[in-house]
Design a protein with these regions (language model features):
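Nucleotide-sugar-dependent
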Residues: 235-238, 300-345, 352-362
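N-terminal subdomain of nucleotide-sugar transferases
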Residues: 1-84, 247-259
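A charged, aromatic-enriched C-terminal amphipathic alpha-helix characteristic of glycosyltransferases
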Residues: 195, 201, 206-207, 372-375, ...
Length: 410
């Protein structure tokens, strides 16, 4: 068993995801002797962002960090594809896939990945990390599983990863009931709570010294930011369940006198028909509310300095306020969007229509302004202390949960 004064080699497998600078908190922790990051090949840019952050802000601790390109998703998917072509008597079993991996891969797992104090795998149902967790267990490796995004649709590898883990890190206790209903599994005895989306304490302290003036200081209007990788304008679109359909809420905000800044990579008709043309409802709103609705480039928050762009805004919208089918809504009820932490990190007050983020409404009412309509939002703004909207937890706290619990479980 590990002791409280021990130092650890920590090995992480899974997507890096947004805000790679979170890992600065790992490097900065005295208990971490070495962080081995096994990243998937489609995350080379995110990995490079971590390297750049370390070189810029913690060059003296670079020796504590090492990265390895792990072609795991590609290898798994190609093996599955080849076996599917050959097999005609039913679906391909996971044991068949695993037995067809090259010996050099298993040697790498045994000689490299297995040589660690804490093997940490995660975080969601679509990045193939749950499959790797299942394989790790079959090879006799103990691991910690962190989990964030999921759906109310049973997925065999997710269930196996949960069952086989030594313990699981969940964002909050609402996931316990979620998985009871989804799989009839009780995780109470092996679950601890910390959110993988908590942002870096080191970065927050660095930004706290920045002198950034709010845009509202210049024009006296409340500026609302929307961060969304993509938005759609077809209200009948089914694949995203209304998640990316922001037209109604933007129009309501504009009519109430707010200035809205939409930062997005892609504006399309729908996920089913991903085309762009004008006019569309978003460009029509720009014409109707000239100077009050701006469509802008995405803010690359992988670069710490770009938080200063986000810090100019007063309010940050968490979701479109439009629900969808049950399997999506069930997760949204317990979800804490990663944008919530981005906004708090930048001194932006998170706002959300009522009824969507039900867990947050019951537990985060002091950190989010929930409103039934935009006129109520306007009234609520007169009652709050904007300076009180600050993050309560950081990735350093996530790491502490991971290491403290590892001392008891591993």
């Amino acid at each position: 068993m590990m002791g409280p004064n021990d130092s650890y080699t920590l090995s992480r497998i899974g997507i890096i995801g947004v805000a790679p600078h979170r890992f600065l908190d790992v490097i900065n922790d005295e208990r971490v002797e070495k962080l081995n990051l096994y990243y998937f090949e489609n995350e080379k840019n995110a990995y490079n962002s971590i390297v750049n952050c370390i070189e810029k802000y913690m060059p003296d601790k670079k020796k504590k960090f090492e990265g390895f390109d792990l072609p795991w998703p590609t290898m798994y998917n190609l093996t599955l594809m080849e076996l599917s072509k050959q097999k005609t008597d039913g679906p391909v079993m996971s044991s068949e896939i695993f037995s067809n991996f090259p010996n050099v891969f298993y040697k790498f797992v045994k000689d490299q990945i297995a040589c660690t104090d804490v093997l940490w795998i995660g975080d969601n149902d679509f990045d193939t990390s749950f499959i790797f967790a299942t394989l790790s267990s079959m090879l006799g490796l103990d691991y910690v599983l962190s989990l964030k995004e999921t759906r109310f649709v049973p997925y065999g590898f997710e269930l196996e990863a949960l069952k086989r883990s030594k313990f699981v890190i969940l964002p909050h206790d609402g996931y316990i009931d979620f998985f009871k209903r989804k799989y009839s599994i009780n995780l109470e005895k092996k679950a601890v709570f910390a959110d993988i989306d908590w942002r870096s304490k080191f970065v927050y302290d660095f930004l706290s010294n920045s002198k950034v003036e709010k845009l509202s200081k210049k024009d006296g209007k409340n500026h609302v930011v929307i961060l969304s990788g993509r938005v759609v304008w077809n209200s009948e679109e089914t694949r995203s369940q209304g998640r990316y359909y922001y037209v109604p809420i933007i129009q309501e905000l504009l009519e109430e006198g707010f200035v809205v800044h939409l930062h997005t990579k892609v504006i399309i008709e729908s996920l089913d028909n991903p085309v762009y043309y004008e006019p569309n409802p978003y460009t029509e709103l720009m014409k109707k509310f000239q100077g009050s609705f701006l469509i802008e480039r995405p803010i690359d928050l992988n670069d710490v300095e770009n938080y200063k762009l986000l810090m100019r805004y007063d309010l940050g919208l968490l979701n479109s306020g439009i629900g969808g089918k049950d399997e999506f809504n069930e997760f949204e009820k317990i979800n804490v969007p990663n944008r919530f932490y981005e906004y708090l990190h930048a001194g932006v007050v998170p706002i959300s229509p009522k009824g969507m983020l039900q867990y947050m409404e019951s537990k985060f009412s002091d950190q989010v302004l929930f409103f039934k309509d935009v006129s109520e939002l306007r009234s609520l703004l007169n009652t709050i202390d904007v300076g009180s909207y600050k993050p309560k937890n950081f990735f350093a706290d996530f790491l502490q949960t991971l290491l403290d619990t590892s001392e008891n479980f591993l």
